[in-house]
């Protein structure tokens, strides 16, 4: 088992998944403008590395869902605290093996999410499965402990940044490498690297 990104990416590390050499879930490279020229024009160039621990979100309202199965029409309606109702909709269709038109996801006002709810969460799918099995309505609410145990949180992140500045404080160039530890089964949280 690897407990940090550096170990998982080290030479000779066991490849965890077929088609993912170097144990990289995804690599994104972006270049804008003349970075080398920007550093050459800088009066000051600073380079530093930062480490950010994994974060578990603590929203005020709990993770909860109400699922209703309409047996007569073969339709599911799910009310959930999600930030991404369309992703939940697609995941429910796939997991319940239903046509997408047979599923409706309702997202009420979400008081807090902080990125925690930017992927389909297990309790949403479980609520849908239970409602169908019961042939009616199921309400599922996770305790704080259950939420911490079943969610990946925001991944541990290492950032190496180099920045060029003029004497007036204008930024002339930035070079950054950001690595997030997503684990063997990365979730949507890895997309936060792009924000």
Locations of the language-model features?
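Structural alpha/beta core scaffold segments of enzyme domains
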Residues: 1-195
């Amino acid at each position: 088992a690897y407990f940090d990104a550096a170990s998982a990416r080290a030479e000779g590390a066991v490849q965890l998944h077929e088609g993912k050499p170097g144990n990289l879930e995804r690599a994104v490279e972006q270049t804008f403008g003349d970075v080398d020229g920007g550093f050459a024009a800088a009066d000051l160039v600073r380079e530093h590395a930062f480490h950010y621990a994994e974060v578990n979100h603590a929203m005020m309202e709990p993770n909860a869902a109400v699922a209703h199965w309409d047996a007569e029409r073969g339709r599911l309606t799910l009310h959930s605290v999600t930030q991404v109702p369309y992703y939940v909709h697609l995941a429910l269709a796939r997991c319940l093996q239903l046509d997408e038109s047979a599923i409706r996801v309702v997202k009420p006002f979400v008081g807090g999410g902080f990125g925690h709810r930017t992927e389909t969460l297990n309790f949403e799918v479980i609520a849908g499965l239970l409602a169908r099995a019961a042939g009616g309505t199921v309400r599922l609410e996770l305790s704080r402990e259950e939420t911490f145990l079943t969610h990946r949180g925001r991944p541990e992140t290492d950032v190496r940044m180099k920045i060029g500045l003029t004497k007036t404080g204008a930024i002339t160039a930035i070079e950054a490498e950001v690595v997030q530890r997503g684990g063997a089964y990365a979730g949507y949280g890895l997309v936060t690297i792009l924000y």
